[in-house]
Amino acid sequence: MIITAIVNQKGGVGKTTTAIQLAAALANRGMSVLAVDMDPQANLTGTLVPAGAAGEGALTVYEVLADGSDPRAAVVPSAHPHAGVLDVLPASLFHKSLSVLDAAIGNNPDRYHRLSGALRRFEGVYDHVVIDTPPARDTLAYNALTAADGVVIPCEPSLYSADGIAPLKDSIDQTKAYTNPRVEIVGLLMTNYEHGTIVSKRMRSAVRDMAECLGTRVFDTPISHTTAVRKSQAAHTDIFTFDAKCSAARDYDAFCGQFLECVGGDGDGR
């Protein structure tokens, strides 16, 4: 079971979109995938989970982390069929929000290990776990980094997209030093990319420089800017279910292939 966190401590760079599409792309390749929503906005849950499945009274990742509830009882299947399995460990906006988790956990010595402990219950069940994270350096983010084998960093072709990279490197370095020495940066993924524009070309060069500083790679396929992604979110579905022939779907599928070349886990490592 390979655990990957989608992380950037700047908001609006495509973290949740990348988590959704990577999880769906892996499931489309016949693998068993668990998507974990660690973002208080719960947008991954709203996209992949059937309406009401994570509503009032339902177990969510909050109860798993704060109360020690069995994570297997909180998992719900995706609302849309795939060739493999796509399940979700959901967040919720309807009752106990992840935004108050810091207060619930306090300074417990295991506060950064709650998610990794919960995910151990799924060994032998899933090929991949994909974690969506908040744009913050908080207990949620450190739980994700402590649980992860690898990190994918989405970044948009803008002057401000790189703002979250330096603090993220510090967070990863601290995680490696204190809670999870195995975590590595798998690569940087360019999102919302407008081919042929001067800004995108300049930022692609800048992202390559960032990757070199981080000791990692830039994935070969940037994710094209397209309205189909926003439309798929409005339809509460992944891009492959919404329009498998659009440029973003092709790009995310190509990225998934490159991701698997980096991490393995093609379905035989369960």
Residue ranges and their predicted role:
Residues 1-270:
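P-loop NTP-binding core
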